[in-house]
Each structure stands twice: as C-alpha cells, then as structure tokens.
Curated annotation (Swiss-Prot):
Protein name in UniProt: Glycoprotein-N-acetylgalactosamine 3-beta-galactosyltransferase 1-B
CC cofactor: Mn(2+)
Pfam families: Fringe
Residue spans, topological domain Cytoplasmic: 1-8
Location relative to the cell: Membrane
Organism: Danio rerio
Length: 374
C-alpha cells in the first residue's frame, strides 16, 4: 500500500508540475510576443474580418447589394468609382450546395465585392449565404437549364437595378473594374453580349461558358422573351453553345471584347496556361477560338477580365496581384482610351423616367381604393 501511495503521489506531483510549467511558459511567450509588437498592429481576428466584410453588403431578396465600391484608403479611384455608379453590373454566380464552402465563399470574399449586385444561383435556397434555389438538379447536364432559369430570375427580380448581367462559375475569377471599361463604350440598350468568343456551330460565334459572359439589358430582355415565344428552347445541355444559338436567333450580337491592341480579355483557363503553357496542336482550343490564339506575354490584355479553373487559394492570389501589388517607379505601359460613360448615363435617365411612370400608374391604381376608404 505504501508503494502504491508513493507512486500515486509521484504521478500527481509530476502532473501538477507539468501543468504549472506549461502555464508559465505560455504566459512568458504571450508577454514576449505582446512586447515585440507595436500597439495597434495586432492581427485582426477572423470575427473582426467577417464583421468588416459584412458591412460592405446589404442582403435583400436573396441577393447581396454592395454598399460602396471597395478600394484602398488614399488611393485615387475616382474614375473607377464613377464607372461603378454609371455601369451597373449584376453578377450571378453558378454554384451548388456542395460548393458553397469550397468555392463560392471565396468568390464572395474576393472579386464579387466589385459587382453592384451579386446573386449566387444554386439548386436549393440557402438564406444564410445567401443562395437562390431554382429547384433544379445538380450536374453538368443541368447547366443550361440552370442558366435559363437564372436569367429569367434576375430579369424578374433585378432588371431595373442593373444595366449589364454577368454569368460566372464559382471557379471563375473576374476583374469587374476592367469589365466596366469595356462595357462603358456600349449602351445597355443595344442587343449585345461579350465573353471569350468561340466559332464552331454558330455563324457569329458564341461565348465560352467557363470564361463567363455578360448580357446587356436588351439582350437579357430578348433572351427571356425568346423562351416565351419559343424561338429559343431547352434542347441541349451544352450551355454556352445553346446560349449562342439562342442569341443569334433573337438578334443579339456577339461582341468583340478584345482591347485596342487586339488582345483577349476573357480567358477560359488559369493565367499560367495562357502565359507559359503550350497548347498541343491537337488540343480542341485551337479550332474553337474565333480570333487567332496568342501564347506567352501577349496572350492577355493588361485589362484582362476573367480566368477560369481558379481554385480557392488562387482567388486570393489574383486579388492581391490585381488590387495590391505594384512595381515602384513604373507607369502603366498600356494607356487605354478613356471610357465613354455618356451612353449608360442616358440609360439611367430613361430608367428613372420609367420608374416615375410606374409610380404614377400605381398611384392611379390605388386612388379608387383610397376614395372608397374616404
């Protein structure tokens, strides 16, 4: 018994001593770390970052409305801010329940903050994220059906709140400010859409689904009307090709999204594939691109708009390269023409006039009820 008691006392003492040493070292380490940092330089907690991020969004009708155009304090973003107000872009992102944490949340935290409105389209509703559920199945064979339903949804819910309507996947990275520069030269009242232009099967070409594509307000209206009149139908699961065939039938032009030096802005692969990769001559890509393919540094515009197959970590890398990294002492080598923002400005005036007419009509419709009450 004495041996057992002595052994128990030893273990208890060892445990108490170990715990005391751990607490002492932990406190010493905390003090040392705290002392080595300047006041106010502590890293933000995850909770603080999330709270700061949420301040930029207003959640309404299962959509996220940006409350301001994000850019760095002290940075001259006057032109970007002006375009943000005049060239209003709704971005809807194709995702699914299994991809919200793996992919969609990284889109939400990076490039989508530069859209005016963001809608995440899924097969089921998720009010917390939020996503709009279209009661569709998941899978590649459902892509065009989800696309049809999504454009109908944004037409019904948000047609007066944006001028352009961008479709992107949850593994597509988009530089929305560069997209505004392209769109500012065009009126949203013109039937046109832009993206990475492919050429087979459609006379005027069609836009790559993975690189994303953007419809003008008039193109969106015609697309929805095309299904009502059965000019367009859901006959294939190949989303981008079917979209292009429908666009041609309803008189929506496939626009040229290249910059003034004829360099591509929408890209169906990650940057390194275009910059350093060599596509085999047997690769389908050579036969699909509407314009000649250029590999290497001239592959991509300095004002590139999108890249596809971008994983979560590369979302943040591209965000850093685009909005943070600068080489000291250099001016931009590419001086693009100033965007013409007059056309969207006129459209905004027409939209306001239309809203006034609608409000006046609503007042007339309500007046008999008011008279009855009086």
């Amino acid at each position: 018994m004495k041996a057992l008691g002595a052994r128990s006392a030893f273990y208890v003492g060892f445990l108490v001593g170990t715990c005391s040493l751990y607490l002492l070292l932990r406190q010493a380490g905390f003090t040392r770390d705290s002392g080595s940092r300047e006041p106010g330089t502590h890293d933000k907690t995850l909770l603080e970052m999330l709270e700061e991020e949420n301040k930029n969004w207003k959640k309404e009708r299962s959509a996220l409305f940006n409350l301001n155009h994000p850019h760095h304090t002290g940075e001259d973003g006057a032109l970007a801010d002006s375009l943000y107000k005049r060239v209003r872009i709704l971005c809807w992102v194709m995702t699914g329940p299994d991809n919200l944490e793996k992919k969609a949340r990284h889109v939400k935290a990076t490039w989508s903050r530069h859209c005016n409105i963001v809608v995440f389209i899924s097969s089921v509703d998720n009010p917390d994220f939020p996503t709009v559920g279209l009661n569709t199945k998941e899978g590649r064979d459902q892509l065009y059906w989800k696309t049809i339903r999504a454009f109908h949804y944004v037409m019904e819910k948000h047609s007066d709140e944006a001028d352009w309507f961008l479709k992107a996947d949850d593994d597509t990275y988009v530089i929305v400010d560069n997209l505004r520069w392209i769109l500012a030269r065009h009126s949203p009242e013109d039937p046109v859409y832009f993206g990475r232009r492919f050429k087979p099967y459609v006379k005027q070409g069609y836009m790559s689904g993975g690189a994303g594509y953007v419809l003008s307000k008039e193109a969106l209206r015609r697309f929805v009307e095309g299904f009502r009149t059965k000019v367009c139908t859901h006959t294939t699961s190949v989303e981008d090709l079917a979209m292009g065939q429908c666009m041609e039938k309803i008189g929506v032009k496939a626009g040229d999204s290249r910059d003034t030096m004829q360099r591509e802005t929408f890209h169906p692969f990650v940057p390194e594939s275009h910059l350093t990769g060599t596509f085999p001559k047997t690769f389908w890509y050579w036969n699909y691109c509407y314009y000649p393919i250029v590999q290497g540094p001239q592959c991509c515009s300095d004002l590139a708009v999108s890249f596809h197959y971008v994983d979560a970590s590369h979302m943040y890398l591209l965000e850093y390269y685009t909005y943070h990294l600068r080489a000291f002492g250099y001016k931009y080598r590419y001086q693009p023409p100033e965007p013409n923002v007059k056309a969207p400005e006129k459209v905004e005036t027409r939209v306001l006039e239309q809203k006034d007419k609608v409000e006046a009509q609503e007042e007339e419709n309500q007046s008999p009820e008011l008279n009855d009450k009086l």
